[in-house]
Amino acid sequence: MELSEPIVENGETEMSPEESWEHKEEISEAEPGGGSLGDGRPPEESAHEMMEEEEEIPKPKSVVAPPGAPKKEHVNVVFIGHVDAGKSTIGGQIMYLTGMVDKRTLEKYEREAKEKNRETWYLSWALDTNQEERDKGKTVEVGRAYFETEKKHFTILDAPGHKSFVPNMIGGASQADLAVLVISARKGEFETGFEKGGQTREHAMLAKTAGVKHLIVLINKMDDPTVNWSNERYEECKEKLVPFLKKVGFNPKKDIHFMPCSGLTGANLKEQSDFCPWYIGLPFIPYLDNLPNFNRSVDGPIRLPIVDKYKDMGTVVLGKLESGSICKGQQLVMMPNKHNVEVLGILSDDVETDTVAPGENLKIRLKGIEEEEILPGFILCDPNNLCHSGRTFDAQIVIIEHKSIICPGYNAVLHIHTCIEEVEITALICLVDKKSGEKSKTRPRFVKQDQVCIARLRTAGTICLETFKDFPQMGRFTLRDEGKTIAIGKVLKLVPEKD
């Protein structure tokens, strides 16, 4: 069976994604090769390894399909990379190849793109929804689209690649299970994306910080005249990327998979391409379908970090369920404001459903709270198991990039799960030796680039957070300043407020 054609029964042909819910084949839950991606890797000596200690929390992904439909595993894929690497184009092409966007719609986009002299961008219009993005050809919000393979249901998070949009990218990465780093093989473009100031480095680092375990590197634009499906150019790009990705904390043998492709022609995305006989391995979509299952558990406490909210016959919140399961009619609490709410309705990837499990992207209609009383970064919890909230915490941080020294009193912007808040480093507690993990006996007066320290941080307002040990997804963070990611960190302990 072709991998991603809609399954047809009883002689029916055209089906919308909604109808096809009723028509899917039974898929065995216990897939061979299950288990978390990228476990048991050798300790690499890099700052990021220190971030990735025991993650025993159930992995935040699972799926409950609407009644009567078989279950497919939900996986969030974030496309990352430099601004013109071709992320949206690949996203659009995948939507087309898996039958989520039909030829007519694609041709309409192609015509509109031509009229605006944006010819090669037509595929990305399937993802870029608003006019401003289409005019600029840049993806600003995190675009959302989904496609299905035989065994899995994928949501594409198309994260922007422009420098000023990195905070949006962080939101995308914090919801992703899997990252696809799109690299342009075109002469000059690869170099721009990768050199200082290019987005490639920062995006890969953010994905790792956000807890993305598995990275697929698509070397795109292989059809470009400057590349012409050259194996040498492909290997050259690979060689330059591996040391960097290793430094960020990805294990090249277990966590990274490279493949060549062309987003514009669709070569090597769904079917093996004749252009690169030198590439042995599955094309992109079959490779995704055959990934081992993510370890998942529905028994954890309910945690749903809010990404966005709007008014529509009540208050609707958007987010990815990180842990636990939610059902219609359930009483929940919105933290940190301890607002009691009731679940009136649930949409999982725009399909109405009564119960959902971790990993699903949800729109939840709530009763008992106004839209203006909610901010991104708030968290929906079980009344009997609230998340922690506060302003002061101790954390281990790694200074990634900062020209000058950092002293107590330093201010930055904290990005933790879906929350963005101003933060001050109020005290430096000790330095941590990168290799041995030993802590210094004396308090440092300052820290500088590439050092690891334990520090006390205090946010401007109350935020929801957990220790990294208890809940990795809500205990890892980045610090940004002047448009750059300057540090990554993990929460070690919450410090109670003094009255």
Swiss-Prot record:
GO terms for cellular component: cytoplasm; cytosol; cytosolic ribosome; translation release factor complex. One of its GO terms (molecular function) is translation release factor activity. It catalyses: GTP + H2O = GDP + phosphate + H(+). Residues 220-223 are annotated as: G4. Residues 1-69 are annotated as: Disordered. The keyword Flavoprotein does not apply. Residues 158-161 are annotated as: G3. Keywords: GTP-binding, Hydrolase, Nonsense-mediated mRNA decay, Nucleotide-binding, Protein biosynthesis. Residues 41-50 have a biased composition (Basic and acidic residues). Its EC number is 3.6.5.-. GO terms for biological process: G1/S transition of mitotic cell cycle; nuclear-transcribed mRNA catabolic process, nonsense-mediated decay; protein methylation; regulation of translational termination; translation; translational termination. Residues 262-264 are annotated as: G5. Residues 137-141 are annotated as: G2. Component of the eRF1-eRF3-GTP ternary complex, composed of ETF1/ERF1 and ERF3 (GSPT1/ERF3A or GSPT2/ERF3B) and GTP. Component of the transient SURF (SMG1-UPF1-eRF1-eRF3) complex. The ETF1-GSPT1 complex interacts with JMJD4. Interacts with PABPC1. Interacts with SHFL. GTPase component of the eRF1-eRF3-GTP ternary complex, a ternary complex that mediates translation termination in response to the termination codons UAA, UAG and UGA. GSPT1/ERF3A mediates ETF1/ERF1 delivery to stop codons: The eRF1-eRF3-GTP complex binds to a stop codon in the ribosomal A-site. GTP hydrolysis by GSPT1/ERF3A induces a conformational change that leads to its dissociation, permitting ETF1/ERF1 to accommodate fully in the A-site. Belongs to the TRAFAC class translation factor GTPase superfamily. Classic translation factor GTPase family. ERF3 subfamily. This is Eukaryotic peptide chain release factor GTP-binding subunit ERF3A. It comes from Homo sapiens. The gene is GSPT1.
